[in-house]
């Protein structure tokens, strides 16, 4: 029965993998809904405040670029050739074949540069033209041939085209997607979890599928009780921070990166790149030892993975074949950053890692070290791929003390079968003296890449994964140990462990979404489908809606507008959806239908607006205290959109302060004009920009 369950788990997992490769969007079991277009008002203020409402920020975001491109191609009143020019340059730069690049260079020159010169529009500088012509006349087409044009293209795009984009529906759609991204709060319900594929000290790794996009990931779940039992809280939080550091910015194809982190009451969850090809330790046992050329392929890709970490001042500290995972095509990624450490501010000195791979300085108590330790481990790993064991684990000994002693004292004897270049590489990597070790003499990974063993390697070709892997994992197999062989934790171990509020507080900042990776996921799966469906829904809504709430946004002094929830209804216990409009002197709360007159709250009636959110019905809320003689003195507002709620709170308090300052200023002026004696029952009243007075009973 257990065997049958294992087979069924494997079949289910493999079927999910195959379907996600073809049409991941079709595998989405949960619909992704964009917020109402009115969120534009809130997001405009948010992006402006965060310094993200500029051309380069939006243009360099995956979804921002796609929507700006859509605007240029389909919505702009005038043709925008600069974007097509830009895309052709980028395509040219990615073209590997020199002959193809020559043809593309000529086409780009004829269609964009020559055409612009003949039209006498003078959009580009003479310097840019001369630079390109100089190379073309010599029949040369370097990759950066058109680079002088890029900055000039950006200068033109960020002018009128970008300003028009900010006024368009495509920018509204960008605001909707950005708002959705910023409000991501993941739970286990957002994933379909498949079979277990690995286990570590604190938890397990499963294959999983993201419900709203259909994309397959690996889910690493750490048990909070087991972490507490082993006092591993800082290790778990450190792993999250290291994954964030290597996963943000320029993507590295040779590290298992993270897209999301979230937690439940019991688990810490990392959503990571899924690698289906097994690890090098597994393949070493199946395939046998590797040849020098085969090892060279893996070494080159690992070097680029380490280089990515080291540039971010991260020392990996656990390099070994078991942590090198293969994808379905045979390319590698370095996995498991549980022991990785940031050395930018303080160098570590803890003896952590795997015996037989740890550098001498890591084993020496109290000795600080940095990324140099990884190059020693790298040498140990290469030796194992070639010989089947660590250079310091002779005769299959498992005695950790003996292995450590040999690491600190033994000179490794390299087999005669090794080439001279390989011998020299390993001798330099396995130097106990850090100052003489390859990779540690001032130039880091470049020193290793320039070694004679790697002579002839085109490192750009390595980066774009153009070299053929020596081993392609079998398709239609899980390439991992059987689910029952992997086993499970003994629940009795943590039976007496209780998690309290202080334990949970440690993880309150744990949840995270890596923006560029989420946007890439969306663009590859459901972006077009969701946009099409949302366009249809919004068109229907516009036809039904009697009042267009945002119609007066440009023409009036409206500060902020959008949907918000107000506590009211029967017994003042229900949330009512309102369309709110904030003006300098008042807040208008319109019913959803727009049929009735809005509820008006004037700023001179407001006594106080809470500076912090109050908790009401388990919701973060804005509390407005008013004094008009007819209310209970409180108005409670909330919004499921965290970004929106913060902007409403900030804008309301700002409008109230300005109103109070204006009232105070006008009262002083009135005192100077009419004298200090006045009717204390009268107060200044601002309405629609006009000033009058009203008595305490409301009469004028």
Curated annotation (Swiss-Prot):
CDD domains for this protein: PH_GRK2_subgroup, RGS_GRK2_GRK3
Keyword entries, A-Z: ATP-binding, Kinase, Nucleotide-binding, Phosphoprotein, Serine/threonine-protein kinase, Transferase
Cellular component GO terms, alphabetical: cytoplasm; plasma membrane
Encoding gene (name): Gprk1
Active site: 318
Lineage of producing organism: Eukaryota, Metazoa, Ecdysozoa, Arthropoda, Hexapoda
Region (N-terminal): 1-190
A Pfam family reported for this protein in Swiss-Prot or TrEMBL: PH
Domain spans labelled AGC-kinase C-terminal: 455-522
Family: Belongs to the protein kinase superfamily. AGC Ser/Thr protein kinase family. GPRK subfamily.
Binding site for ATP: 197-205, 220
E.C. designation(s): 2.7.11.16
Function comment: Specifically phosphorylates the activated forms of G protein-coupled receptors.
Source organism of this protein record: Drosophila melanogaster
Recorded catalytic activity of this chain's protein: [G-protein-coupled receptor] + ATP = [G-protein-coupled receptor]-phosphate + ADP + H(+)
InterPro entries the record matches: AGC-kinase_C, GPCR_kinase, Kinase-like_dom_sf, PH-like_dom_sf, PH_domain, Prot_kinase_dom, Protein_kinase_ATP_BS, RGS
Protein name stated in the entry: G protein-coupled receptor kinase 1
Residue span, Protein kinase domain: 191-454
Domain PH as annotated: residue spans: 557-657
Location of the RGS domain: 54-175
Any one GO MF annotation of this record: rhodopsin kinase activity
GO biological process, alphabetically ordered: G protein-coupled receptor signaling pathway; negative regulation of phospholipase C-activating phototransduction signaling pathway; phototransduction, visible light; positive regulation of smoothened signaling pathway; regulation of signal transduction
